[in-house]
Amino acid sequence: KLERTPSEESDESEEAFMFHTKETLGSMHQPLMFTAWVHGVSGMCAMILKLWGFKRYTASNGCSYWINAPMAKEDEWVEARRETGDDARPILSGCAVDDVDAEVAKPIIFVHGLGVGLAPYLPNIAQLLRSKPGRKIALLSLPHISMRATPKVPEIDAMVDTVAELTTKHKLRAPCLYGHSFGTFVIARTCHRYRVSSVVLLDPVAICLCLPKTVSILYHLGNCWSSFKSYVKNNGTKAMFTTTFWRDGGDVLYYLLRDYFLVREIGVMTALRRKFWWATHNLWADQIPDNSLIVLEAHDMLIDCEAVAKHVLRQSNARVIWQDNFSHGMFISPWGFSLRHEVATFLDALPTHS
């Protein structure tokens, strides 16, 4: 018979067991005006993408994407091939080995993170188009993590199926998978199922997903409200309108807004709690393709950047960019131009036939 020691009993009283797939969903209803605003932002983004030459398609499983390349005829589709050897995964490429059509640049498949969809990434997409005007770019659209009213929350494997399908239907030769935040989970799962040429991961929450910091940030949402109340109690409500608060207490406000207006949205909560399997979506460094780039923003509050950087540098051949003084998602801001330019330069240098 096993008996717990006093130290184990004390640990149990301090740490609660987490079972995110069975616990109460914990979602919050969003105001109708807020949902309407999000859909309006999505509509404006769609208009801009159409002006830039993108067209929206729906995959066979219902997931949608935008791409600036035409769909090939069905008799030209090339199924993913396998090579002999120990690695039995099919190769993610929509072109045959003997297809010699020249590509202007490495095709890109981009997967966005939590937020309001593709709209915040438009400056990033614009820079990629300017660096190589003829570049083929596909953009996965994930409305269930964009705070939009949607009746279905797909599994991540369904998003991976969409990546493979669009690669085949639009004849993308060995595309580079480019993802931010939640999008890195889709890319991680794609790397598990396919042999991928290269990846670019921004704020890679999928790498070392087992680290305690990532776990606590994603699921221990109740602490943000108590932290905010404690800050106001100790400093008074007037403290919220001082420069000191925005410098030192900004993190508290960030968590409050994020947890109660973004992460608590029903589609996002379903994706993170009911459709999320840790072991399946985790990415280890030795699973990252050689011609890859990992971008870490030093003040990222969602991941342990130092631990991730050490793991990637020790166990893979990927290049790592460490951006000081940036927090999660700041690369999409106006002052992230140079960082986006560095990513575009990396993508421009990738070989198109491997």
Question: What is each of the regions a protein language model found here?
Answer:
Residues 75, 318-354:
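Catalytic active-site module of serine/aspartate enzymes centered on a nucleophile-bearing elbow/loop
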Residues 95, 157-175:
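Conserved acidic catalytic loop of the alpha/beta-hydrolase fold
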Residues 101-147:
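Conserved HGGG/HGGXW glycine-rich cap/lid loop of the alpha/beta-hydrolase fold
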Residues 120, 294, 301-307:
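Conserved alpha/beta-hydrolase "acid-adjacent" motif
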Residues 124, 290, 304-314:
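Short alpha-helix in the alpha/beta-hydrolase fold that links the catalytic acid
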Residues 142, 200-212:
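Active-site nucleophile loop of the alpha/beta-hydrolase fold
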Residues 178-188:
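Gly/Ala-rich beta-loop-alpha elbow adjacent to hydrolase catalytic centers
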Residues 288, 294-297:
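Short beta-strand/loop motif that positions the catalytic acidic residue
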